[in-house]
């Protein structure tokens, strides 16, 4: 573990990823409650999948559509799946393209800072823009490589940051 409180498992690196169909629940929430909201939405999505007898095709994720650390965040908790959706759990797509990736354990803020610095240091840029309400991302995800259904201790999760590049 580094002095920043983050345990780097792999990366940073660039990888080309294919488009991925998803199911997810999307909400606008305050930054200060985002992680509690993520946990609530994750529990809701897991319960929905169980009730509908759907086994995900891949890991769960948190997608940040819009980031405003002083205001509201547009977030989505989802999972890779091509199953039928409803009005609450909606279909979506993680776009294909070149992604900057970093796999880590423990704390997300230093991991995000590390990946963003690495992207800049490589002369790359994240596919985002100022929307007037915050920074809007083409795709910025935390992918939970550890299944939250089997490991409840979040500090033990291996998380992959995946930021779509321009």
Question: For the regions a protein language model found, what residue spans apply to each?
Answer:
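A solvent-exposed interaction/effector surface
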Residues: 1-166
């Amino acid at each position: 573990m580094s002095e920043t409180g983050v345990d780097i498992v792999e990366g940073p690196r660039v990888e080309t990823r294919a488009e991925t169909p998803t199911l997810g629940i999307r909400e606008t929430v305050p930054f200060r409650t985002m992680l509690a909201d993520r946990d609530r939405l994750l529990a809701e999505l897991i319960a929905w999948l169980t009730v509908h007898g759907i086994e995900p095709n891949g890991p769960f994720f948190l997608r940040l559509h819009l980031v405003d650390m002083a205001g509201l965040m547009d977030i989505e908790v989802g999972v890779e799946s091509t199953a039928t959706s409803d009005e609450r759990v909606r279909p979506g797509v993680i776009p294909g393209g070149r992604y900057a990736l970093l796999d880590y354990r423990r704390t997300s803020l230093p991991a995000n800072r590390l990946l963003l610095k690495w992207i800049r240091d490589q002369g790359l840029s994240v596919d985002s823009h100022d929307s007037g309400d915050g920074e809007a991302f083409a795709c910025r995800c935390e992918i939970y490589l550890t299944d939250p259904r089997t490991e409840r201790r979040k500090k033990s999760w291996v998380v992959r940051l995946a930021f779509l590049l321009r």
